[in-house]
Amino acid sequence: MVALSTLNMVNKNLTDTQNRVSSGLQIMSGKDNAAYFAISETMKGDSGMFESIHDGLTATKNSISTARLGSETVSDLAKEFAERVAFAQGSGVNLADVQAELDSLVTQIGTAISQSTFNGEDLVSGAAATVTVVSGISRTGGTFAATTISFQSVNLTSIQTALSNIDLTALDTGSTDAAVPDTLQEALQFAEAQLSNAIDAATSLGVTEKTIEGQMTFLDMLTDTLDSGVSAMVDANMEEEAARLQALQVQQQLATQSLSMANQAPQNIMSLFRQ
């Protein structure tokens, strides 16, 4: 009975060790360690959510990056526009020729705006609006909440519209329309104002892009930390398990031999009586 009990215990330990070696885990279910299992499963869930949020922020960053590049292009074109209007302030300048250049620049601005979308998301051509994206999760006690980042989209279309209202060949000093300059000096002021707006738009989107990148880096660090924590709780020490497996295999062989010898003992005694 002792030999059989020993063999059964060795076989059970051997099976458990083989499971740990094959899975790489020392805690595979709540049966192994309820507290560690519950904590590790929660941490795994958070890690998975962080990875999904990171993927979402990647798409957001790409949209913002595209919008920023568009804003920088519009800013460069608006700068060139203002320079041409400044040139027109001189005497003897053919305003019609300068206006043709300005019209071309306005068209280029429109093209840049139309191409500044990513995956259908437009952050540059509508009225400025607040955009909110999920940036992470927060756990306090038993409370779960999502954290967010908000930023402003920009309106480059208004810049294009304002610049298109400048017509150096049709200045009207008697005009009462505040959206249309009526002198060369006013035209330059209009152009400079829109250049400033374009620079502000590019700067705002650049700051937002940097913020998103920082949050993505932070999420990477959090995910690595959570994964390391889970590993420390549930992963098996493979060197120890391999040594234990080898020792248990030897014990199994010895226990099997002991049981075999125990089973043969009654037969040996009976053979003595036969003699």
PLM segments and residue spans:
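Short loop/turn microsegments at loop-to-beta-strand junctions
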Residues: N119, L245-Q246
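Amphipathic alpha-helical coiled-coil/heptad-repeat segments
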Residues: M1-V2, N8-K12, S22, Q26-A236, ...
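Extended, low-aromatic, Leu/Ala- and acidic/polar-enriched alpha-helical coiled-coil segments
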Residues: A242, L248-Q249, Q253-T256
